[in-house]
Amino acid sequence: MSDFTQTLDTDGLATITWDCQARPMNVMSKQGFADLNALINGCLTDPMVEGVIITSAKSDFAAGMDLAVIAETKDMHPENPAQGCFEMVMEIHQILRKIELAGMDFKTKKGGKPIVAVLPGTALGIGLEIPLACHHIICADNPKAKIGLPEIKVGIFPGAGGTTRLVRKMGAMAASPYLLQGKLCSPSQAQAAGIIDAVSTTPLEDAKAWILAAKDTDLVKPWDAKGYKMPGGAPYHPAGFMTFVGASAMEIGRASCRERV
């Protein structure tokens, strides 16, 4: 059975629900991405679909990527495992970019379908990277939930766009604790930091209302809009350059301290 299923209501709103039934929390697999991609394709081409909600049937959204996928991909490409992993990551990028553009004409920035992520609870790794590609992120008012990109803690980095989207959304300095330290936060902290858009006691209802009220301009990511400037300065802007230099020095120092303890 697929980890992703879809329903369509009378308002033309499709709800894609993630539910890995054999696991206590959702984790992403290669087949899971293929299933999600197929549903997104269907929603974007179906004239009956006005907008999409991506959510979870569980009390949490997702624990991240199934790390076994990396090992499996390497085994499938013994002659060049690095190339195999690269191609897999690029396929994931294409799926998330498809969600981000949502069928819009890139020149006119019109014609897209609004896609909202509704997080009932914890969203980690790919469980946050998928929402970051959506046009609006609403998290349930769940104080036990944790939101973040903890990949760095196991020696990898958020390879599905988390590094680029979070930096472009928040700026390098603000994003660095989440990317370089794997910092996790509560829904209210994530909203205050600008990672998610809203915390709600009725997230599904709020998502439907947002979709029905959304305009073309609401679907355009800041970094796709004309005149976009990265918060805090781009890497080679004077302010941005100092951020990158300072962040590198601080992380090297922090890592050295941990090694000595």
Report the location of each language-model feature.
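Intrinsically disordered, low-complexity segments enriched in small/flexible residues
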Residues: L13-T15, K30-A34, L39-I40, A174-S176, ...
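Glycine- (often His-adjacent) and acidic-residue-rich active-site loop
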Residues: S56-I95, A123, K153-G155
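Conserved CoA-thioester-binding segment of acyl-CoA-metabolizing enzymes
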Residues: M1-T55, E79, G253
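Hydrophobic, secondary-structure "cap" segments at the distal end of domains
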Residues: G162-M173
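Glycine-rich beta-to-alpha active-site loop
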Residues: I99-V154, Y178
